[in-house]
Amino acid sequence: MSTAEITANKAAFERFHEAANTGDAEVISKTIDELVAPDAVIRTPLPIGATGAEALKQVWAMLLRIYPDINLTVEDLIAEGDKVVGRTTVTGTHQGEFMGVAPTGKSVTYNEIFIFRFAHGRVVETWGVVDVYAQMRQIGVIPA
């Protein structure tokens, strides 16, 4: 993979996060359509039945309901070959039901790490680790 392709893949990762930070479901959905292959393989367990790009759209719709003011800060971004790895800090206010927990109004900060694999300029596979424990602790489900 060329240096230009690696640079473009990193830019796509950042663009995805910039779209997420708009808090606008339509902007996020359009960005997913542009950056993610419709049949992308999502290797992160998701609480929905959809697959591919549609799964990501549904996850983001859910996240915007839970944390309408969600904000992602990319702390580290590493690219090699066809993969981009990002470590992100996520903040938001718990304003929608989350895993059966009614809104608490509490501020939440958690970390996640995602790997995006690219082919022909689009995301074709993802892996992710999201710190759900931190979210549950901060909204009071798990004792601190």
Where are these regions (language model features)?
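C-terminal and inter-domain tail/linker signature
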Residues: M1-A144
